[in-house]
From Swiss-Prot:
The keyword RNA-binding does not apply. One of its GO terms (cellular component) is plasma membrane. This is UPF0299 membrane protein CGSHiEE_04225. The chain crosses the membrane at residues 1-21, 33-52, 60-80, 92-112. It is a multi-pass membrane protein. Its main location: membrane. Belongs to the UPF0299 family. It comes from Haemophilus influenzae (strain PittEE). It is found in: Cell inner membrane. Keywords: Cell inner membrane, Cell membrane, Membrane, Transmembrane, Transmembrane helix. InterPro entries: LrgA/CidA (IPR005538), Uncharacterised_UPF0299 (IPR022957).
Length: 143
C-alpha cells in the first residue's frame, strides 16, 4: 500500500514538474503556445529519449485520464455561462476556423497528390530503366 502510494506521488510529481517547466518556457518564450502544451512536449521528449520511464508516470496519468470528464466540467460550465458572448463574437471565431480548415485540406490534398505522382513516376522510371538494361539499350538512357 505504501509502495503504491509512493508510485502515485512520484508519478504526480513528475507530471507536475513537466507542467511547471512548460509554464516556465511559456513565460520566457512568448510564442502563444500554452505552458501545458510545452509540458506535454517535454514529457513526450522525456519518454521518447527514455529519460522518463513509462512506469514512473503510469499511475498518475491513468488516474488523471480516469477522471478526465470531471476535470473538463469547469470548461463546459464556462462555455454555457458565456454563451451570449460567444454568440456575439461568432464571426471572429468561425471565419478563421473555417478558412484555416479549408486551406489545410487544400494544402494536404495537393501535397498528397504531388507526392503520389512523384512516387508513381519514380516507380515507372525504374521499370523503364530496368527494361532498357535487359535489352542492352543503355546508350540511349538519360537519367
Amino acid at each position: 500500500m505504501i509502495q503504491k502510494l509512493f508510485l502515485l506521488v512520484r508519478s504526480l510529481v513528475i507530471l507536475s514538474i513537466m507542467l511547471s517547466l512548460g509554464n516556465l518556457i511559456a513565460y520566457y518564450i512568448p510564442s502563444g503556445v500554452p505552458g501545458s502544451i510545452w509540458g506535454l512536449l517535454l514529457l513526450f521528449l522525456g519518454l521518447t529519449t527514455r529519460v522518463i520511464h513509462l512506469n514512473w508516470i503510469y499511475l498518475g496519468a491513468s488516474l488523471l485520464i480516469r477522471f478526465m470528464a470531471v476535470l473538463f466540467v469547469p470548461v463546459s460550465v464556462g462555455i454555457i455561462k458565456y454563451s451570449d458572448l460567444l454568440i456575439e463574437q461568432i464571426n471572429i471565431l468561425l471565419v478563421p476556423n473555417i478558412v484555416s480548415t479549408c486551406v489545410t485540406l487544400l494544402v494536404i490534398g495537393f501535397l498528397g497528390h504531388y507526392l503520389y505522382q512523384m512516387q508513381s513516376f519514380t516507380h515507372k522510371r525504374k521499370k523503364v530503366i530496368k527494361r532498357k538494361r535487359k535489352s542492352g539499350k543503355t546508350s540511349q538512357l538519360v537519367c
